[in-house]
């Protein structure tokens, strides 16, 4: 359980640059000399699993079994280093993960929340991310759409090899289609065809397959829809008897897809198409034909596991991997697998060193777009995370979580050497270096070591000659803020 281990592992931001909802690049510090956790931050999870999976048959007797359990428990919880509150947080986080669905457990273990509150925040952000429409990779998204459509046979009525019809022919086709629909009262056989139409609209919109020759007064989205819908074989749309034929659910819908209430406005018709999920059929009544405009991005694809709905089938497929735990995208360098291709692309930049996202203000480059957005908040001053108690705003969600401990009085990180308690694990780790004498920050110029990164930064100014603190009165500069403050007193005395 990587999430449990993070109470032991400190994620210290190298720079307090503002933040997005996403995890930042962090510098991991781990309190450990005994078990080599500095080399392998996943060791805590290994110890936890060994403790939980230990069985009586692994020992020669009850005394050895108890002794071995005690040893494994200490390796996992490390009571010689952690306070009661920290151990309690570990146990609570473990139990919280245990009650989650397996797919969410795996996702959280990969993202390693520091505590239960952060785990909840991550899950809420994941839910928001899945609900938000995101632009699809045109090539990959188009392949997924067509593969899915071909597998269900929904495109058998389409001529995929023929070019897009001229716009004038499409308008005629749509008019004929509208008349055919209105002539058939009751159930209609065109459900499957309309399903194909919706898929094609999304494919064409995604791939930006727009032909020239826009008509006057025609909107951009209408033209894309008409070009997509014009490719349907009109003769096949008109098959079926007046009483209507039930159309069974497509094979891919048996588990993954559910067509919610689907209302779509076509330039030549205004209608409401009702989906009967219980029967797996579609019906249309002449009394239901209304004069209303419909949201073209209505969510049509519903997950049968959790009920969440999506406007594109590709997003449902991506969401389903949370439930199935499928990770089809593996890194060739280290073998790590991901459920999203975008996650793999971002991960591979660690190996390649590529940083394609550059800040237009200062030129600093980043591996991911989220890191750039977070960095941009330094320039814009944006602070989207606000405390409900005092109204103070923050640029990072993690900073807000830490701030809230001021109101709750939570100081769950206690030093076992002196009993002093802290609200953040990072402060505890820095404090414990007083007792351990650890100095992990070493100057490359002279080899001198320090217990805090800020102390190393100040020291390096001796070598670089940098004096960033300037007196506004006389323009004299100083290496340290304390030197500037002491100097400014000479002006105030005068």
From Swiss-Prot:
Domain of life: Eukaryota
Segments forming C2H2-type zinc fingers: 301-323, 329-351, 357-379, 385-407, 413-435, 441-463, 469-491
GO CC annotations, alphabetized: nucleus
GO biological process, one term: regulation of transcription by RNA polymerase II
Keywords: DNA-binding, Isopeptide bond, Metal-binding, Nucleus, Repeat, Transcription, Transcription regulation, Ubl conjugation, Zinc, Zinc-finger
Gene3D superfamilies: Classic Zinc Finger, DNA breaking-rejoining enzymes
Protein name: Zinc finger and SCAN domain-containing protein 30
């Amino acid at each position: 359980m990587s999430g449990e281990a993070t109470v032991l592992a400190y994620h210290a931001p190298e720079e307090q640059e503002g933040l997005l909802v996403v995890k930042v690049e962090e510098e991991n510090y781990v309190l450990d000399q005994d078990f080599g956790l500095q080399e392998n931050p996943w060791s805590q999870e290994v110890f936890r699993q060994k403790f939980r999976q230990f069985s009586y048959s692994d020992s020669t007797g009850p005394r050895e079994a108890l002794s071995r359990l005690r040893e494994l428990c200490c390796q996992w919880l490390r009571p010689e280093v952690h306070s009661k509150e920290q151990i309690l947080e570990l146990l609570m986080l473990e139990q919280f993960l245990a009650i989650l669905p397996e797919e969410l457990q795996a996702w959280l273990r990969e993202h390693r929340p520091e505590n239960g509150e952060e785990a909840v925040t991550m899950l809420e952000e994941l839910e928001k991310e899945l609900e938000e429409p995101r632009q699809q990779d045109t090539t990959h998204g188009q392949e997924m759409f067509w593969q899915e459509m071909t597998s269900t046979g929904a495109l058998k009525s389409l001529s995929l090899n023929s070019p897009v019809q001229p716009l004038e022919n499409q308008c005629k086709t749509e008019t004929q289609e509208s008349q055919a629909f209105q002539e058939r009262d009751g159930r209609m056989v065109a459900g499957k065809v309309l399903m194909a139409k919706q898929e094609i609209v999304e494919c064409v919109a995604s791939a930006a397959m727009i032909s020239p020759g826009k008509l006057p007064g025609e909107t951009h989205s209408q033209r894309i829809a008409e070009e997509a819908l014009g490719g349907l074989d009109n003769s096949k749309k008109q098959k079926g008897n007046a009483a209507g034929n039930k159309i069974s659910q497509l094979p891919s819908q048996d588990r993954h897809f559910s067509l919610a209430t689907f209302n779509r406005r076509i330039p030549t018709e205004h209608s409401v198409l009702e989906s009967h999920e219980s029967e797996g059929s579609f019906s249309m009544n002449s009394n239901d034909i209304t004069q209303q405009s419909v949201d073209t991005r209505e969510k049509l694809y519903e997950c049968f596991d959790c009920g969440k709905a999506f406007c594109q089938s590709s997003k449902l497929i991506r969401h389903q991997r949370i439930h199935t735990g499928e990770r089809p995208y593996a890194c060739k360098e280290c073998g790590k697998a991901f459920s999203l291709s975008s996650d793999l692309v971002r991960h591979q930049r660690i190996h390649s060193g590529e940083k394609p996202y550059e800040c237009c203000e200062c030129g600093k480059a980043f591996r991911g777009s989220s890191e750039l957005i977070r960095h941009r908040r330094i320039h814009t001053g944006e602070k989207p995370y606000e405390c409900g108690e005092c109204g103070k705003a923050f640029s990072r969600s993690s900073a807000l979580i830490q701030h809230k401990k001021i109101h709750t009085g939570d100081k769950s990180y206690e030093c076992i050497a002196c009993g002093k308690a802290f609200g953040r694990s990072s402060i505890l780790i820095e404090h414990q270096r007083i007792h351990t004498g650890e100095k992990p920050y070493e100057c490359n110029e002279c080899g001198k070591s320090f217990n805090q990164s800020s102390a190393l930064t100040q020291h390096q100014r001796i070598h670089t000659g940098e004096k960033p603190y300037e007196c506004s009165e006389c323009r004299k500069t100083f290496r340290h803020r304390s030197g500037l403050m002491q100097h400014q007193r000479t002006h105030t005395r005068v």
